[in-house]
C-alpha cells in the first residue's frame, strides 16, 4: 500500500490523527492507497482534524483493502478525506476488487462525528476491470463499501459491507460504473437518524 501493509499477508494498523496531512497516498498495483496490499489485512483509523487524499492502485481501494482484501476503515471527527478506488473495481473506501463473500469476510466502514467535529468525506469507486474484448470484466467499485468481482460466476456475491454512518457528516459518494454509491452487491444502504446539517450525496458515474 502507499501507506500500510505489504502484500500477501501484510497486517497492521494505520492511524492518522491530529492535524496530519496526507497528500496523494497512492497504492501500487493491487494495493490500496492507504491500507493493505494484495491479500492483506490492515485497519485504518483517521481522526482528529486530519486531511487525507488517497488513491488505490489497480484493483485496490483508495482507503481500505488491496486486491482480494477486506477494508476496515474508521473516519471520525473533523477530518477531510478524499479517496478514489483503483481501476478494476476497487472501492473508494472499503474493499479491494475480487473479494468474494462468505460469513467471515466483510468490509467494515464507519464514518461519524465526535467532539473534534464532523467529517467531510468524498469517495469515488474505481472504474471496471478492462476485459480483453473491449467489454468490462467487472463492474465499478462502490464509492463506500465493497469492491467488484472480476469475471464473476453468475451467482457469486461480493464480500458484504458493514457500513455505519453516525452523527453529523458530509459525504459525497460517486459509484464506479454500474456499482453502488454506498453499499455492496447492488444494494444501496440507507442511513437514518443523522444529525441536522448532514448531507449524503450519492451519484452514479456518468
Predicted segments — roles?
Residues 1-27, 34-56, 63-86, 93-178, ...:
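Surface-exposed loop/turn motifs in large extracellular/passenger domains
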